């Protein structure tokens, strides 16, 4: 901002507001700036504004951008050369307790979340998946268990199955694509890629 006669001039030279304004700021790369948190933590956290793509097989610790619900058990998860292993808990996302759940805060109105999931060992009582969670009463989940993937919309604490498909492989990629107030839930395996719900 430039000051003229004790008044701020936001767009000098144009004399009016425009749709865009060019601001001359030096480029900042937090991964190389010794004063930045990203640099000081040894790239434990993602660079601000960067794509959030994680390869858990190469991680020693979770970055600070990962969140947990309430007070999780210390041994709730493990990072190994095979990836991120969450230990099963009877607590669900609908309870005001500490489920086996690791999250990243949604930062944009348009985004896509994907997770590769091993399905062996999953049953109707031992389910795993991904979710967009607003609270214990409002969430969109895609869960795999008992050779089936279910898309569950929870509103006011009531679950409604809005899509499902048979799971044939021992490994699937689950996805939730958000576009403003709409969501598309998908699943892919070695043979197919399908939309489970929109």
Where is each model-derived feature located?
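Beta-propeller blade signature
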Residues: 1-4
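Extracellular glycan-recognition regions
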Residues: 6-198
């Amino acid at each position: 901002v430039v000051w003229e006669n004790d008044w701020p001039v936001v767009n000098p030279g144009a004399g009016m507001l425009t749709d865009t304004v060019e601001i001359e700021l030096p480029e900042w790369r937090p991964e190389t700036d010794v004063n930045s948190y990203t640099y000081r933590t040894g790239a434990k956290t993602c660079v601000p504004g960067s794509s959030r793509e994680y390869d858990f097989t190469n991680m020693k610790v979770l970055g600070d951008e990962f969140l947990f619900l309430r007070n999780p058990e210390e041994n709730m998860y493990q990072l190994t050369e095979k990836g991120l292993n969450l230990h099963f808990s009877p607590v669900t996302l609908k309870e005001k307790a500490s489920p086996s759940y690791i999250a990243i805060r949604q930062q944009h109105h348009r985004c896509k979340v994907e997770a590769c999931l091993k399905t062996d060992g999953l049953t109707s009582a031992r389910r795993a998946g991904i979710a967009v969670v607003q609270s214990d009463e409002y969430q969109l989940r895609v869960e795999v268990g008992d050779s089936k993937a279910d898309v569950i919309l929870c509103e006011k604490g009531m679950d409604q199955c809005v899509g499902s498909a048979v799971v044939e492989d021992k490994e699937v990629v689950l996805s939730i694509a958000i576009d403003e107030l709409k969501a598309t839930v998908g699943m892919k395996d070695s043979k197919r890629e399908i939309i489970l719900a929109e």
